[in-house]
Regions:
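A generic structural signal for short, non-catalytic loop/turn and secondary-structure boundary residues
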Residues: 68, 146-148, 163
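Extended, compositionally biased non-globular segments
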Residues: 105-156
Length: 193
């Protein structure tokens, strides 16, 4: 279901199809979903899945393609191969490409900001306040970019801080996008029915 036929009529499958998908995923900003993003060079699909096959494929972490209303081959799902998250360490957000990208971007941006502070901030109340302020700025920026909802960067009250260390906790909701829209129609035979 991740295979496609290119504009030359050749079937693109296996590593080549995976590489093409990876390129599109990498080029998509973390604030955007890959769902309904066109696959460059794809002309049509070799097969169409039945609904039960589609649902089973998504549950099993298969990145699916479909043809949109304009006849373009597009990503139809934004799931990855993680199908059974570790319940103690992961939630279902890790199963989604967009959300995993936002989370890894958060790690990277906070790590870069914290690296600037290591060895330069005192292990005092004021130093800890500085770390919290700098971490919160990173998270607020990501919220302004539409990637996080109500993020907080706080001192871990269970572990605290000492002369040369500090433990902090990030709480945030990463923004997802609607991947499916369901419409329920309620028609009436007449105005009086």
């Amino acid at each position: 279901a991740s295979d496609f036929i290119n504009s030359d009529g050749e079937t693109v499958s296996g590593p080549e199809a995976i590489a093409k998908a990876a390129g599109v995923i990498a080029a998509t900003p973390s604030s955007k979903s890959i769902v309904r993003t066109e696959i460059p060079g794809a002309a049509k699909l070799p097969e169409r899945l039945k609904n039960s096959q589609y649902e089973n494929a998504v549950r099993n972490g298969l990145l699916l393609l479909s043809v949109n209303s304009d006849g373009k081959v597009v990503f139809d799902s934004g799931v990855n191969t993680l199908i059974n998250p570790d319940e103690e360490k992961q939630d279902n957000g890790w199963k989604k490409i967009k959300r995993a990208k936002v989370r890894h971007e958060t790690f990277y941006r906070l790590d870069c900001e914290m690296d600037k502070l290591i060895g330069k901030v005192n292990g005092t109340k004021d130093g800890i306040a500085n770390v919290i302020q700098r971490g919160q700025v990173v998270l607020d920026t990501m919220a302004d970019e539409g990637k996080l909802i109500d993020p907080t960067f706080k001192l871990d009250t269970n572990k605290g801080y000492g002369a040369d260390y500090g433990y902090f906790v990030v709480n945030a909701v990463d923004v997802d996008t609607l991947e499916r829209i369901f419409i329920h129609y309620k028609w009436k035979y007449s105005e009086n029915s």
